[in-house]
Amino acid sequence: MASPVPHVEGTLTRYLQEIRTFPLLSLEEELRLACRWRDAHDTDAAHKLVTSHLRLVAKIATSYRGYGLPVGELISEGNVGIMQAVKRFDPDRGFRLSTYAMWWIRAAIQVYILRSWSLVKIGTNAAQKKLF
């Protein structure tokens, strides 16, 4: 019987392959979608903005591998950051969403690391907790 949960690394590889299928946006298309989101709260426009920047999230998240946390979790937190960036992005300021989003993605990942990472690792199962 197959396991209902696929192998983690295979899942991450598949996710990284899937995000490559989303097209990158031109400056004009990005501005048009950002204005549609800002003015009419068009969720389709926001979805296209988020999905077109998932590669940026993965790139930034993989740079935080050295903390011993799962890369999939770092990417998930980065995805929260890109959603926050799209929500707050002002296209009239004259810069690209990727420039603005980079700061929100990093902030979300760093907050997750601070909440999750510890120099002293605490036992997670009963056998590890009995050790001390």
Model-derived features: positions:
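Alpha-helical promoter-recognition and RNA polymerase-docking modules of transcription initiation factors
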Residues: 2-132
